[in-house]
Amino acid sequence: MPSPINRTKIVKKKTTKFNRFQSDLFKRVGASWRKPRGIDNRVRRRFSGSRAMPSIGFGSAKATKDVCPDGFKRFVIRNVQELEVLLMQNRRYAAVIFHGVSAKSRKAIVERAAELNIKVTTPNARLRSEERE
């Protein structure tokens, strides 16, 4: 199994949950974030004491964005031929098998990934332990 190319520490700056304005006051207003667009809205005008709006400052660092805790980025694989793309990038990307791939194709993908020294995130998913006879 390849080790990741660099294990920079993933820092989550501020994991604020952004709820919709007045979602705590009215049941009909869901908590899912919507940008306020009213002319008098105090959240849109960023008054002190009002809730924060999502902005670019809450984002992750560019070096660790989309990096999973094991140090790899994910790349979705649909067939055996797509593994060839990861041949030179096997220390940066890990393969994720697409959800609609059959068990027979999954087995072939996992075997080929082992030959190419590519990490597969869930190699045993949806594989039978014994074949039916």
UniProtKB/Swiss-Prot annotation:
Keywords assigned: Ribonucleoprotein, Ribosomal protein
GO biological process: translation
Name of the encoding gene: rpl32
Keyword Ribonucleoprotein part of the UniProt annotation: yes
Family (UniProt): Belongs to the eukaryotic ribosomal protein eL32 family.
Source organism (scientific name): Dictyostelium discoideum
Gene Ontology molecular functions: structural constituent of ribosome
A GO CC annotation given for this chain: cytosolic large ribosomal subunit
InterPro entries reported in the protein's UniProt record: Ribosomal_eL32, Ribosomal_eL32_CS, Ribosomal_eL32_sf
Keyword Phosphoprotein appears in the UniProt entry: no
Name of the featured protein: Large ribosomal subunit protein eL32
Pfam short name (any one): Ribosomal_L32e
Domain of life: Eukaryota
